[in-house]
Amino acid sequence: PWGTFILASTFEDDKTAAETHYDAVWLRDSLWGYMALVSDQGNSVAAKKVLLTLWDYMSTPDQIKRMQDVISNPKRLDGIPGQMNAVHIRFDSNSPVMADVQEEGKPQLWNHKQNDALGLYLDLLIQAIDTGTINAEDWEKGDRLKSIALLVAYLDKANFYIMEDSGAWEEDARLNTSSVALVT
């Protein structure tokens, strides 16, 4: 329903899509798509739509609650349960409210600790503000400004520079220099 995202993949059959969840909207993949669009001036309107919709996703009540919970208690990120307490990096492409990917009626367990995606998001958002692509009217909508401030505080409280995450390759949790670099 969004029309402003690039799905990781599309499938002819719903069963394959449901098994892989590559039909979800992924923050990182959408940001790379945004970068491709913004590099072509003829696609600047589409690029801005992608970035604003991602900003809206990061400003949803669920995302804001995750950030606030970690700011209040960074230990919520500890261990495997902490993977679901992290800011989420993907959502169901068919959800009108950007809800989690579901399995059997519950959010699918996933390692959402992917600070590289969060760092890339902040970097591109700041660049768009700096260039005037995003203006005051854009950032005043809803909880967008609040979500930026909370995300910065979340990364600080999470000690991103020593936090193990699954990184860009979504591998086992470890300290990834690519994640640390993108946040800094």
Predicted regions and their residues:
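Acidic, mature catalytic/reactive cores of soluble proteins
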Residues: P1-T184
